[in-house]
Amino acid sequence: VRPEIVAIGAVRTPLGSFGGAFRDVPVWDLGAAAIAAALRRAGVAGGDVDDVIYANCRQAGNGPNPSRTAAVKGGIPVPVPTHTVNMACPSSMKAVMLGWQSLALGEARIVLAGGMESMSTMPFLLKNARWEGFKLGDRTLTDSWSDTIDPLVGYGMGMTAENLAEKYGIARDEQDRFAAESHAKAARAQDDGLLDAEIEPVRLPPTRSDPDGRVVARDESIRRETAAAKLAKLKPVFKKDGSVTAGNACSMGDGASAIVLTTREHASALGAKPLFSIVASAQTAVDPAVMGEGPAHAIPRALERAGMTLRDMDFIEVNEAFAVQILANERALGWDRSKVNVHGGAVALGHPTGMSGARILVTLDNVLRRHDGEHGVASICGGGGVTTAMIIRRER
């Protein structure tokens, strides 16, 4: 009989805006903050963890196995192994899935999973300089953001969003209205303190002007003044006559998330109160040209494995890479929008890619508790057409 796997600690950092509060913070320090907080909330010592499975997508300049650095700095002893997961945007949810599988196989008793990202510290690259040298002529400085271009299709995620708009007939004004509502929901949730339970404040390093170090406790990218009429004035970014803009797409950012997993039996032995149990998960891959429709494939597969339907889900968290992507999946799945991203999504909060998959699980757990739900599903798509989905049940 497969053991039941539960989460006993789940947390995220605030989401810093691109070039914002975390601009100069190394990615492993963000990861360490989330890891230390998850251990503390779970009541687990770092030495009790058997494995750390942690994600980081934008790894240029972050050293070998950057999650190992984050783990040790976050209180995990040196003898505990760590590996870094990269599955594009679903990476940290995949890390949770791998942790779940490791526990179910009896290979570990406690696993820490999650992910981190610092988009603000992504470097510029001088490719081929090692071999071509600098004797004469110009050289091109390449932004490591070029890694977001999918070689399978030859363009970035923004064009895949434009493809979705065309495929599903989603107009610009519908995207702008959705984006404005995402910001409005996030602002209300922040103002009402609904996000506080899932966030662990981060203290920045001391500076001359702030010798104690500033404490960052709130998400930075939420724009309270956002309205569809304002968004309508923005120009398309990815296609001359397109509909996807900086306003109806997710923003870049920095942050980390972490979840402590164990078996129900071991949680009982520890005297730890489970937050949620994992019911089922799934991963799928679709045409990279329309990568954003992945949740429409992964969610039904996870539901089938759980023997449940979408109507059984009290709440749904789908990462908002683009407003059009959520609307496309809504057309495909026919979900009740009032259940989706009720505290706002990545269009408002930001999308630090390596941490978002676990972040939406942390958020879903918080939403289920805040609004007295029992079951929820989370899903996230990624470059190359990969997608993950996970169903969780709130523990009472």
Predicted features and spans:
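Conserved catalytic cysteine-centered active-site region
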Residues: N56-I110, P151-M157, E225-S251, A332-I360, ...
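Active-site-proximal alpha-helical scaffold in enzymes
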Residues: M87-E117, A165-L194, A258-E265, E330-R331, ...
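Flexible glycine-/small-residue-enriched beta->alpha junction loops
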Residues: R2, W100, I110-N163
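Condensing-enzyme catalytic core mediating Claisen C-C bond formation in acyl metabolism
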Residues: V1-V25, A227-E293, H297, E304, ...
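Active-site pocket-lining segment
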Residues: Y54, M159-E162, E198, R208, ...
